[in-house]
Amino acid sequence: MFVRSALFLSAALMLGGCDVKTELGKPCTLVRKATAEEQETQGRKFVEIHEKDIAADQDFISFGSLDCEDLVCVRDDQSPRSENPEAFAQGYCSKECVQGTTTGCTITRTVDDVEEGLKDRMTCRPLLLDQDTLDAIKVADEGFYRRTFGENNSPYFCAGATPTSQGT
């Protein structure tokens, strides 16, 4: 009898305590695939992107960021920038999402490292080319597609809504 009660109590506690935390919104460094020369000299497949490499007021998505559980780091046009052009460009961890859904992009991090205001702006929106264009590129040259976009098959990612993406 005691064993059954203990198992039941353990199961109830485990189910009640399953508050899933993700890395969505966690600060990350934007990266790009290293050139063959960079891979040879640095011994890494990815290199950090500098502030000077990203135009102001643009969304940027980076695949391969080891800072993020889904390897996706995003910076939207409302994200803060460093004044130092040589500084590594920073963004926040993201993930693929399903167009039209209202769940899945909620930031659940409890640590105080999420960009101010990002929790209120986070939404599911396209950051890549439209779906038809992505599909056409994949059909035309799947190798190029994989080198450019990896295993991602959707243009939709969790990202901070901007006035442009909100239609204002």
Indicate residue ranges for each PLM-predicted region.
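Extracellular glycan-targeting catalytic surfaces
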Residues: 12
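Secreted, cysteine-rich disulfide-bonded mini-domains of extracellular proteins
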Residues: 19-168
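Bacterial N-terminal signal peptides that target proteins for export
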Residues: 1-7
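C-terminal motif of bacterial Sec signal peptides marking the signal peptidase cleavage site
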Residues: 15-17
